[in-house]
Structure formats: C-alpha cells, structure tokens
C-alpha cells in the first residue's frame, strides 16, 4: 500500500508522536501505545473519516458537528490537563484565613508532587463526584485502577499549603456531605444512649462503649434517610478536595501545647497570619469600614452578642494589635481557649485532648513498624483498615489483622498532618486524623483571581492586590 502524505503531515505526525511517547515514558506505562495507530491515521493515512461532517451538504449537520467536535476536543484536553498537570480550586471556607481567603481561586499544580494515575479514569471532566442539575454520580466505578503516582518535581515539605482529598470522605451521607459520618455516628450514638462515665475505664472497656455508640448512631443515620439521605462510598480521587497547611511529616511526632505545634519536641513556626478566637468586648459595634480595613469578614463578625457588647471573633496577631489600639471602640480582648469542639480524632477514644492541647501522636511513615496496643489502636486503625485495606478486628482484647493475631504493624504509605491557619475555625487533622499519600492532589502555585464575597462588583469585589500572588510566599 502506497502512503501519500505531504512533508508537513509527516512533521506534524512526528511532533505529536514524540510528545505522546514522552508522556508515556513519564507515566511509566506503555498501554498508551494502542493510540499510536490512530495518531498515524489522523495525520498520515486518513482511513478513518474523522471529519466526515465537513463534506456534508447539509449546513445544519456541518454547524452542529463543528460544535460537537470543538466540545469533545475541549473536554478531552481538559480531562488530560486536569488529571496530569494542573486544575483550578476555589477556597470555599475560612479555615486558612488570613493566609488564603474565601473567594481565592488557585492554580493548583499536579506536577509539583507528581500527578496520580486516575483511580476512576471514566469520569466527566470539570466535576468532582456529582453531575450538576441531575445530582447523579459523575464517574463510573469500573474500571478502578490501583494507586500510582508519577514522578513530580518534589515532595510535600513542612508548612506547604496542599490540596488533598478529604480522608473521611470515603463514606458520605448525601444530604450532609460536609459532615464526617464517623464523628456524626459516634455523636448520634452518644446522644441516643445512656451517658457513661469512662474516666475509670481501661482501653478495652472504652472500646466496647464506643463500638456501641457507633452501632447505634450509624443505625440511626441509616434509618433517617429523609434527614441524612443515602449513605454512599466514594473512591479516593472522587472525594471532596480540601486545602490546608502541612504541619507534620511522615515519621515525626506531633504535639500541640498551648496552641503551638511541636515536632519531635521542637516548636514549629506559626504561620504569619495564624488566627485564634478572642472575646472582644466593645463600647459600640465595630464599624463596617474598620472591619473591612482590618480584613475582618462578615462571617467573622457574625458572632456578636449585643446585650453583652461582645464579639467572639478570629484575629491574626496584627489585627488583634490594631483592634486593641482603637480604645474608642474596644474595651478588652481576651483569649478563647480551645476545646474538643464536639469530638477530636480519634473519635473512639477518651483522650481529654483539645484543639489547643493535642497529642502527642506519631505520624505513620512508609516502611516503619509500630507496636500496636488497645490504647494506641484508635489512632492508627483507620490507616490500617480504611486506607491500606486490611481486615482489622479486636476479639477478647486481642488485635487481629487479616485473621492473624498481632501486636505490630508496618505501614505501606506515608501520612501527613494538615491544619488550617484559622486554628479555631478549621476542620482538619485534629478532627479526622492523618492524610495518606494517595490522597495528595497537588500544590497551589498562585492566586489567579480573588473575589470578596462581602463586596459587590462595583464596590471592590475583585481583590486586585491578591491577583497572581505566589502561594509559596504566604508563610
């Protein structure tokens, strides 16, 4: 068969082929070689009528198919770009304020830590897990590929701001998707059963009580479908995206003492814009213009008690100092101590920890082995069972993993400890534990757009001073 193709066609084919092969080398996968004959046909032989509609005499067909062709091309391009190179992420909550603000749009690099090969490859581009309007799943559970990460430019570093999949989002009640269903189950079970004093109980006795709480609470959630909706499971890469700061690396021992994070006994530097809650007693309400000047949002101002003339408000060190200087408005500013805020991780252990005084906990590291006891098992059982896929049971005070009695476990993945800079208003690792390496999505590089939810379009909605701010410069 004689192949007739112009020099220009061969050059285009060669460029595309080289790029495609380089991409496969990066992935360390040769499955993509099946695409090469189609590339060859598209540029050289043209046996498959890829653009048959261009020869149609029907103008409607030509018009419609030109749009279909453009949309399909765009979706395929977006699919590959979002999977392997970068994606957009918008800050939905105040957990990282005042480092990252609600309404910041982030350019998130997948290549910084290495992109994951998709675990659910068949999904609709530009959706995370749900199709809008119809509210159905935007992905197919088959095929399901094992976790694999392509080599990136580096690894997660201490104090990096990281985008990751929500670890406790493996099981979700669809009507309350933002809630951690495990914590919700324990809380519901505790409220529905007779109060139990666990102060004098050992670890085995506590476990029996918490197991009962969970069973009762989960049954209640399953029955109250009108309130909670169906309880569904989600694969790792289809879980909600979160963004926090990494304050603990694999193999480190983390402890929070009087609000300060210690790693292996050494205090870690707090973020420049770290926030804590304070009781601000005032002569009169804080004016809107002053609040805006100081970066205090309407959300922050919501907790105002007019009878007591007092705010319960998160402040950075600089904002606290500036507000305290306004003696015409402020009477006093007092610390608000952290508490357990409805149940800290692990939710099935009576630790007595608070958001300001937590731990110590050792962060699991790949290849490291720990001694397991009933006392430390609640801290690590989700790593062993939910994240690394082992069968874990406790019978007669003994620990069984995959049917074998054991008192040790060797971790198969690295784990990280993530926290928000808004320390008293952040659902983070203090509430749901470790972030496994297979949940890491990428690294925010810069803010490409920032919209103030408290302002109108003609009243400073666009935060021009934040545009193209490098996230690495936000310490």
Where are the regions that the model predicts?
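Extended hydrophobic leader/signal-anchor segments used for secretion and membrane insertion
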Residues: 1-475
């Amino acid at each position: 068969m004689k192949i007739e193709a112009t020099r220009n066609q061969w050059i285009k084919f060669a460029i595309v082929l080289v790029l495609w092969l380089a991409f496969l080398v990066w992935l360390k996968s040769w499955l993509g070689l099946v695409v090469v004959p189609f590339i060859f046909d598209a540029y050289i032989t043209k046996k498959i009528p890829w653009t048959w509609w261009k020869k149609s005499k029907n103008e409607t067909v030509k018009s419609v198919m030109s749009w279909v062709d453009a949309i399909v091309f765009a979706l395929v391009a977006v699919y590959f770009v979002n999977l392997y190179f970068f994606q957009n992420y918008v800050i939905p909550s105040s957990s990282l304020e005042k480092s990252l603000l609600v309404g910041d749009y982030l350019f998130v690099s997948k290549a910084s830590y290495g992109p994951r090969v998709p675990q659910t490859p068949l999904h609709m581009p530009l959706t995370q897990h749900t199709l809008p309007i119809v509210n159905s799943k935007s992905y197919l559970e088959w095929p399901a590929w094992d976790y694999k990460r392509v080599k990136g430019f580096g690894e997660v570093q201490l104090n990096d701001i990281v985008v990751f999949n929500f670890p406790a989002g493996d099981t979700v009640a669809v009507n309350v998707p933002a809630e951690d269903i495990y914590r919700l189950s324990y809380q519901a079970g505790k409220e529905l059963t007779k109060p139990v004093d666990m102060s004098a109980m050992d670890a085995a006795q506590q476990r029996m009580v918490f197991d009962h709480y969970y069973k009762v609470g989960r049954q209640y959630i399953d029955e109250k479908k009108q309130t909670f909706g169906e309880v569904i499971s989600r694969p790792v890469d289809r879980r909600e995206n979160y963004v926090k700061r990494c304050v603990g690396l694999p193999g480190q021992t983390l402890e929070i003492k009087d609000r300060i994070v210690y790693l292996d006994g050494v205090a870690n530097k707090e973020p420049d814009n770290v926030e804590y809650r304070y009781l601000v007693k005032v002569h009169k309400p804080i004016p809107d213009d002053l609040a805006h000047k100081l970066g205090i949002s309407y959300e922050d101002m919501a907790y105002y008690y007019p009878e007591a003339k007092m705010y319960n408000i998160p402040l950075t060190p600089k904002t606290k100092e500036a507000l305290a200087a306004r003696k015409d408005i402020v009477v006093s500013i007092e610390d608000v101590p952290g508490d357990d805020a409805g149940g800290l991780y692990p939710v099935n252990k009576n630790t007595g920890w608070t958001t300001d005084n937590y731990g110590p906990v050792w962060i699991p590291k790949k290849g490291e082995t720990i001694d397991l006891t009933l006392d430390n098992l609640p801290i690590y059982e989700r790593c062993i069972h939910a994240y690394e896929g082992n069968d874990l049971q406790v019978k007669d005070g003994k620990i069984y993993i995959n049917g074998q009695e054991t008192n040790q476990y060797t971790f198969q993945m690295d784990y990280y400890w993530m926290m928000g800079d808004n320390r008293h208003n952040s659902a983070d690792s203090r509430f749901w534990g470790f972030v496994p390496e297979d949940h890491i999505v990428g690294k925010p590089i810069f803010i490409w757009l920032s919209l103030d939810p408290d302002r109108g379009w003609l009243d400073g909605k666009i935060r021009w001073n934040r545009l193209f701010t490098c996230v690495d410069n936000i310490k």
